[in-house]
Swiss-Prot record:
This is DNA polymerase I, thermostable. Residues 173-267 form the 5'-3' exonuclease domain. It comes from the Bacteria. It is an enzyme of class 2 (transferase). One of its GO terms (biological process) is DNA-templated DNA replication. It holds the Pfam family 5_3_exonuc_N. It comes from Thermus filiformis. The gene is polA. In addition to polymerase activity, this DNA polymerase exhibits 5'-3' exonuclease activity. Unlikely to have 3'-5' exonuclease activity due to absence of a 3'-5' exonuclease domain.
Length: 833
């Protein structure tokens, strides 16, 4: 492998880079923005492909781009490339960055006015070959296969090297006949017309029979069948033109002395600054620009106040983990703790990557250690794609190693790098919401919640018996036993033996789908389907909750300690893991019985506080729709009122079916539900569903206007944001693929609503936490739009009033926030209070 920046040896092989094609290809292949919202996917993709090639061919490199002036092809055939989509708005800006990268690397950059990059590359390739050099052409353009020879090969962007033998074996055409092949088949991407009606198979057959297009035309009267001959005769002009357009010129008047060609010394400082500016941390590492290890000044423990900490855990769950190592960094000095657990008491704060985890472990050990600054939280606010320290380190330059001191140094460096990038709104979110919230979550995780283990074990046994009964019924209907958990066996039973019509196929294997959605669509087709769905529901609850939950009770505390993930979702919502409490069914009887197993300690009660229809209230505020705001201000039922508007009735005449339809539309609008999906949900035809959605927007006209405005802002800025400035980048709003673009549109207008609701919940938690202390109450769980607390039995009424007051006044909206509060011995009882 050639050292990346070794310029000593004279070049024996030249690397020619099809710069324009490579840039255009990566522009659409990736989706990447900086934390400032600046699209950089083309620069990154180009750099990665180029870097891969430079590791093998680092000495003589020429990168060729199309010149702005029209080429002879444009002059010869005005339709040439005319059918291509217009140049994307951001392409020229990123192309300028690509060219700057090439210059910083010290590579020769070439543009020849009046000629296309293809012809410049072709001329250079053949000239280098004549001078006895090996040539590699880095491109994804198959046109270059015509240049292949013993000394000329094509290097694809994925690293595959293509030789004449490869082309012959894969396409059945030698390189010298490639132009003929392309002239017959045409190329829509380059508007090479070809012969209409001739595809690759026919072209191969013609070339196998006649050898070349030239010989084919000499013997045109002998071509069979007659219909094929007539096609060629009707498109002779196109065929001749296609030969000219497809052939890469190798005779341009270019003077290049390859033997004297040497790369300039790269501008390493400029390159480092360039990659840092674009936040290509992984490329800094791969280009070797992070520098060698600087001597670290070792200083004694404890560190000074404000130091950043790094630590290693034996496992990711801090309540269960052993603290293996603890270190701190301050102004480049490293402080190492010899007894990590004992050293926790010397710290004033947990500051650094995953600060919350260290705070949880410290609380377990009886040490009150508040988490403060965390570069991961800063990076997450800059771009919610930043969810893990490993990825953040790679993106912004560094490596999240298995060394506590290195982690501390990395935390210090990245925090100092990222913190100044926070805009005014994001800075407020960081200082007033996310940073103080990490302290709240640390205490919630350390506190945990008590479980009624015997109840869970009894329920598990009950489910096991019911699953056995369902299994027996399924076997009876199938006519024989089989493995219900085997998708292949289930597929055979349903579709081969019982003759059901499949609904969809799996993407990877193309097998008939037995997934949940497919089976739900088959409900009613056969009694066995309903039994299988029931069996699966019980099996999932048993394996996900009933059996694992008792094993997750901590032996020291006797409680369950879930982890709350602050940087896991694109909308800002919290998620939980180990276990994930978000997926416990809310409305099913079994889900409710699982909630009954979450209980209070003796002398305490659980308090459940749930925001009522918070996302619809947020939508009313963001859209400013007067009808929507009036419903909430007057305390009316939003679904009944929506139904009244949609059906043109007095609210008193709205029946349950109408209300259900309105409720489905109300929440469906938030998630971009299509008329097709609505028709399935409500069991109505497509036209009726379409009319429902239209009547909804007629009832709430400013909602539609807000959606359109949000999408337009997303396209213009590259991101959408919540009421408080939390961002989500949506580059796919500009996608040329309709399904991708429509999915991005749904995400784009849902995020401000869902994200604002998440922000309101977080603000409420931060405000509530210090006010619970005088009552002796504790926050335990945050699930969906709900908080669960543990309160002393004799302070329950005070706690109910306090929680309701704080949550409903988290932030002033144009409509009131409403919170339903209840208490009980267990979670279910509290919800039903």
């Amino acid at each position: 492998m050639t050292p990346l920046f070794d310029l000593e040896e004279p070049p024996k092989r030249v690397l020619l880079v099809d710069g324009h094609h490579l840039a255009y290809r990566t522009f659409y292949a990736l989706s990447l923005t900086t934390s400032r919202g600046e699209p950089v996917q083309m620069v990154y993709g180009f750099a990665r492909s180029l870097l891969k090639a430079l590791k093998e061919d680092g000495q003589a490199v020429v990168v060729v781009f199309d010149a702005k002036a029209p080429s002879f092809r444009h002059e010869a055939y005005e339709a040439y490339k005319a059918g291509r989509a217009p140049t994307p708005e951001d392409f020229p800006r990123q192309l300028a960055l690509v060219k700057r990268l090439v210059d910083l690397l010290g590579l020769v950059r070439l543009e020849a006015p009046g000629y296309e990059a293809d012809d410049v590359l072709g001329t250079l390739a053949k000239k280098a070959e004549r001078e006895g050099m090996e040539v590699r052409i880095l491109t994804g353009d198959r046109d270059f296969f015509q240049l292949l020879s013993e000394k000329v090969s094509v290097l694809l962007p994925d690293g595959t090297l293509v030789t004449p033998k490869d082309v012959q074996e894969k396409y059945g055409v030698p390189p010298e006949r490639w132009v003929d092949f392309r002239a017959l088949t045409g190329d829509r991407s380059d508007n090479i017309p070809g012969v209409a009606g001739i595809g690759e198979k026919t072209a191969l057959r013609l070339l196998a029979e006649w050898g070349s297009v030239e010989n084919l035309l000499k013997n045109l009267d002998r071509v069979k069948p007659d219909s094929l001959r007539r096609k060629i005769e009707a498109h002779l002009e196109d065929l001749h033109l296609s030969l000219d357009l497809a052939r890469i010129r190798t005779d341009l008047p270019l003077e290049v002395d390859f033997k004297a060609l040497r790369r300039r010394t790269p501008d390493l400082e400029g390159l480092r600054a360039f990659l840092e500016e674009l936040e290509f941390g992984s490329l800094l590492h791969e280009f070797g620009l992070l520098g060698g290890e600087k001597p670290r000044e070792e200083a004694p423990w404890p560190p000074p106040e404000g130091a950043f900490v790094g630590f290693l855990l034996s496992r990711k769950e801090p309540m269960w983990a052993e603290l293996l190592a603890l270190a701190a960094a301050s102004e480049g000095r490293v402080h190492r703790a010899t007894s990590p657990v004992e050293a926790l008491a010397d710290l004033k704060e947990a500051r650094g990557f995953l600060a919350k985890d260290l705070a949880v472990l410290a609380l377990r050990e009886g040490v009150a250690l508040d988490p403060t600054d965390d570069p991961l939280l800063v990076a997450y606010l800059l771009d919610p794609a930043n969810t893990h320290p490993e990825g953040v380190a790679r993106r912004y330059g560094g490596e999240f190693t298995e060394d506590a001191a290195e982690r501390a140094l990395l935390s210090e460096r990245l925090f100092q790098n990222l913190f100044p990038r926070l805009s005014e709104k994001l800075l407020w979110l960081y200082q007033e919401v996310e940073r103080p919230l990490s302290r709240v979550l640390a205490h919630m995780e350390a506190r945990g919640v008590r479980l009624d283990v015997p109840l869970l074990e009894a329920l598990s046994f009950e489910l096991e018996k019911e699953m056995e009964r369902l299994e027996g019924e399924v076997f009876r209907l199938a006519g024989h036993p089989f493995n219900l958990n085997s998708r292949d066996q289930l597929e055979r039973v349903l579709f081969d033996e019982l003759g059901l019509t499949p609904v969809g196929r799996t993407e990877k294997t193309g097998k008939r789908s037995t997934a949940q959605g497919a089976l739900e669509a088959l409900r009613g087709a056969h009694p066995i389907v309903e039994l299988i769905l029931q069996y699966r529901e019980l099996s999932k609850l048993k394996s996900t909750y009933l059996d694992p939950l008792p094993r997750l009770v901590h032996p020291r505390t006797g409680r369950l300690h879930t982890r709350f993930n602050q940087t896991a979702t694109a909308t800002g919502r919290l998620s939980s893991s180990d276990p994930n409490l978000q997926n416990i069914p809310v409305r099913t009887p079994l889900g409710q019985r699982i909630r009954k197993a979450f209980v209070a300690e003796e002398g305490w009660l659980l308090l459940a506080a749930d925001y009522s229809q918070i996302e619809l209230r947020v939508l009313a505020h963001l859209s400013g729709d007067e009808n929507l705001k009036r419903v909430f201000r007057e305390g009316k039922d939003i679904h009944t009122e929506t139904a009244a508007w949609m059906f043109g009735l007095d609210p008193a005449l709205v029946d349950p079916k109408m209300r259900r339809a309105a409720k489905t539309v109300n929440f469906g609008v938030l998630y971009g539900m299509s008329a097709h999906r609505l028709s399935q949900e409500l069991g109505i035809d497509y036209k009726e569903a379409e009319a429902f959605i239209e009547r909804y927007f007629q009832s709430f006209p400013k909602v539609r206007a807000w959606i359109e405005r949000t999408l337009e802002e997303g396209r213009t800025r590259g991101y959408v944001e919540t009421l408080f400035g939390r961002r989500r980048y949506v580059p796919d709003l500009a996608s040329r693929v309709r399904s991708v673009r429509e999915a991005a549109e749904r995400m784009a207008f849902n995020m401000p609503v869902q994200g604002t609701a998440a922000d309101l919940m977080k603000i409420a938690m931060v405000k509530l936490f210090p006010r619970l202390k005088p009552l002796g109450a504790h926050l335990l769980l945050q699930v969906h739009d709900e908080l669960v607390l543990e309160v002393p039995e004799d302070r329950a009424e005070e706690a109910k009033a306090l929680v309701k007051e704080v949550m409903e006044n988290a932030y002033p909206l144009d409509v009131p926030l409403e919170v339903e509060v209840g208490v009980g011995r267990d979670w279910l009882e509290a919800k039903q209070d």
